[in-house]
Swiss-Prot record:
The gene is Agr2. Monomer and homodimer. Interacts with LYPD3 and DAG1 (alphaDAG1). Interacts with MUC2; disulfide-linked. It comes from Mus musculus (Mouse). This is Anterior gradient protein 2 homolog. CDD domains: AGR (cd02960). Residues 29-38 have a biased composition (Basic and acidic residues). The lineage of its organism: Eukaryota, Metazoa, Chordata, Craniata, Vertebrata. A motif (Homodimer stabilization) lies at residues 45-54, 60-67.
Length: 175
């Protein structure tokens, strides 16, 4: 019986030692800053403005735009793209852009849609395209580049803001 008790105690000590992991950082070891921050759940905003209302799919966004008579702003981006990340940071922190964005149906995509009208000059990121409630892509609202018409950089916030105001002036659908 005594042998059994000693064996059981040794087994419990071994198991508890294995299960208890050292969570402290040893001196000289660097702690990864990504590990110190808790992973936030992914939302539809993907960091472009958590207080804004975002749509989940392109089809839903088109429907909401048409029924609410508000223009649609489609932001194409990639999580791994440094240009997309820089534009996202500026977009999310720019108070006037965030306020104006409330008047749009918003969609941000990390994948391409089957609608080729959203990529008239190629599939690149970041790219922002405006769609009128009449479901017409606003080809007249472009960025500052002639080879990437719908590209914006963090320094283009004034142009983006002006283009958002232009997009709010809806196309006339009268016959």
């Amino acid at each position: 019986m005594e042998k059994f008790s000693v064996s059981a105690i040794l087994l419990l000590v071994a198991i508890s030692g294995t299960l208890a992991k050292d969570t402290t950082v040893k001196s000289g070891a660097k702690k990864d800053p990504k590990d110190s921050r808790p992973k936030l759940p992914q939302t539809l905003s993907r960091g472009w403005g958590d207080q804004l209302i975002w749509t989940q799919t392109y089809e839903e966004a088109l429907y909401r735009s048409k029924t609410s008579n508000r223009p649609l702003m489609v932001i194409h981006h990639l999580d791994e793209c440094p240009h997309s990340q820089a534009l996202k940071k500026v977009f999310a922190e720019h108070k006037e852009i965030q306020k104006l964005a409330e008047q749009f149906v918003l969609l941000n995509l990390v994948y391409e849609t089957t609608d080729k009208h959203l990529s008239p000059d190629g599939q690149y990121v970041p790219r922002i395209v405006f769609v009128d409630p009449s479901l017409t892509v606003r080809a007249d609202i472009t960025g500052r580049y002639s080879n990437r018409l719908y590209a914006y950089e963090p320094s283009d916030t004034a142009l983006l803001y002006d283009n958002m105001k232009k997009a709010l002036k809806l196309l006339k659908t009268e016959l």
